[in-house]
Amino acid sequence: MELKSIKKLSLTVNTVILIMVFGLMFFFHLCNVTFLVYFSIPTSMIYVIGYCLIHKNKLNIYVWLVFSWLTFYMGVTTICLGYDYGFHLYCFSMIPTMFVTEYMSYKLNKRSLWAFNVSILIAFFYLICTGYVASFGPVYEVNSKTASAFFWIFNAMTVFGFLIFYSKYLIYSIIKSEEKLSEIAH
């Protein structure tokens, strides 16, 4: 696993997330959820900063920034809009992604990301956000079955797609490492 390939993957993921933030910002505008429109502005800046961190090889800082803000952003959107839009699903994807990233960090001889402890915090945060919605309902009532169905499917497909491709990348990297070790041993 080389730094170059991890940087390329990070740039791709960062670009996809940034595009999604702008798409969500437009959706929030259409639904008159003004708070989330404005909340998307600092969110987009986080991912612009991400490009600088990737460029400067500050991948540990980048990972912490993205994971913490993405988890926070999806928690806020869940509280604002409720379960029907599927934003809470992203918290689930953060947990296995944390462990995959822990492995990548190990392969690059970087510091531990404390995947286990962070995963517990993510689960706790998820329970707080979804518990709030279960107890009090969402902050905004957006009465659009079409929008909620679209976003539930879109968010579920995004989460599953990300998990599948991220896991595939990890397994591919592990296999390549094993093959290199096998070549060296023989």
Q: Could you describe each region identified by the protein language model?
A:
Residues 1-4:
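Short, Lys/Arg-rich, polar N-terminal cytosolic tail immediately upstream
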Residues 46-47, 66-91, 95-98, 105-152:
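Hydrophobic transmembrane alpha-helices
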Residues 33, 56-57, 83-84, 132-140, ...:
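Membrane-interface elements of multi-pass transporters and channels
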Residues 155-169, 173:
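Hydrophobic alpha-helical membrane-associated segments
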Residues 7-83, 91-98, 117:
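Hydrophobic transmembrane alpha-helices and their membrane-interface boundaries in multi-pass
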Residues 167, 171-174, 178, 182-185:
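Amphipathic, heptad-repeat alpha-helical coiled-coil "signal-transmission/dimerization" linkers
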Residues 16-20, 72, 121, 125, ...:
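Cleavable Sec-type N-terminal signal peptides
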Residues 7, 33-37, 145, 149, ...:
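Hydrophobic, aromatic-rich alpha-helical transmembrane segments
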